[in-house]
Amino acid sequence: SSSEQQRWVLEAYRNASGKNLGDADFLTQLKGEDRARNPVDDADAFKAALRYPAINRYWFWRLDYILWELYQNSPASDLFSGLESGEKAAISAYRFKANRSIEHVHPQTSTEPWAEEDLHAFGNLAMISASFNSAQSNDGVGTKFGRVKDQRASRGALESIKMLLMFKAADRREANWSE
């Protein structure tokens, strides 16, 4: 659970506070502890754990952190090529929030249904705020991507780096978001 995640981070901080670790060393220590606590060795079990509704929200936070860190260290990475300046600014200004709501980019109820396996897979999911999720309702992918596009203009308003990259992966068009 999220509270368990918070507890170990606080405990790691307390343990490191007397060791005079620099920021980089402390971050390396945290990442090692995180990998030990959240192993991804069994690919089948990991894939099953990344399915809605059983997915732990931690994985969305972890991915957004990895994407954010990669952008901070390697903004020229192929992953970010093709991003518009507003999208890059949105990632730079990204603020981690206690978002708790999981959104299906392709809606669960749609005139163009998807296979359950694809609909509830991590690739079709993003974690966003409850208020942004309620605005999504059962809207189509194009409407949802339009809202992601609107977020780029508002500093610090990006809900999910993952969702922005999903938008980019679909070449910013609803028709390109498919199973």
Locate each region found by the language model.
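Flexible coil/loop and intrinsically disordered segments
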Residues: 1-179
